[in-house]
Amino acid sequence: VRRYIRDADTSLGSTFHIKKVDSYGGIYFFNIPETCQGTIVKIIIAGGGTGGHLFPGIAVAEEFLRRSRENSILFIGTERGLEKKILGNLGFNLLTLDVEGIKGRGLIKKISALFKIPQSIVQSNRIIRDFHPNLVIGVGGYASGPAVMTAHFMTIKTAIMEQNALPGLTNRILGKLVDRIFLTFAETRAWFPEEKTMVCGNPVRASFLVDNESRKRREGKFNLLIFGGSQGAHTINRAVLGALPYLKNMRQHLRIIHQTGEKDVNTVTENYERHGMDAEIVLFIIDMARAYRSSDLLICRAGATSIAEITATGK
């Protein structure tokens, strides 16, 4: 997977230049050039809900702050999203919108969600006017739509990031409005105006960039990491529980960390205890980079962000 570094002009306008550098695992960085180092940049990153949307946004935010601690980052999300749980611990400010998804819901909930859209646009307008951003980036998720759309009509530069090969509904709509569309896969260009798109890979947080020494297999027990994304995966949880009877002869050689999500945590915990397994059961793993580095084998969903992070750690 190619690694790219992006050079933005000093006004963070609609002109971007890109240059390819060395190969690395699915990573790109927004790079403020030397001529722009003294400029204070204010950026809103909107969206989230799941780790697949949120963590690439955090990677971009970390890189802007690494370039200059005077740059300002504000996240816009929802009260129910993953962003509410973790952004404060990472030192980022978060403001929330009262907005819900529409796709895949019943008629009553769809109507309720539609009625919340005007309110979320008013909330976005107030947040943007108070913060005065140079750029608003949508990372996917419910809050991304109102915030990016509002910024567009306020003539603020906008961009979206699409991590998946098949873009979500929100990004497909926003693609018609924004100034730039940053893609992980070239195939995704078919869904957007091609002149706006740039294939850059999936942003990965700096904590996942490790040296070769930390990738060596650990001595002692075989470490197995099982997770299903930020919300857990019932199918993976059920499959692992079905496999436990076949692992009884390996118990003394095996250590498991299993991130279950909230719904299955009690059932999974009871099954591990009944089979006498050395297992740590968690709802959510904050330091995924450390979890990857300490594992010998990973069993997980093939989410775009998970694959990029796993590739970056050399697994």
Where do the protein language model's features map onto the residues?
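Donor-nucleotide binding loops and adjacent catalytic segments primarily
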Residues: G81, I86, L90, S214-L298
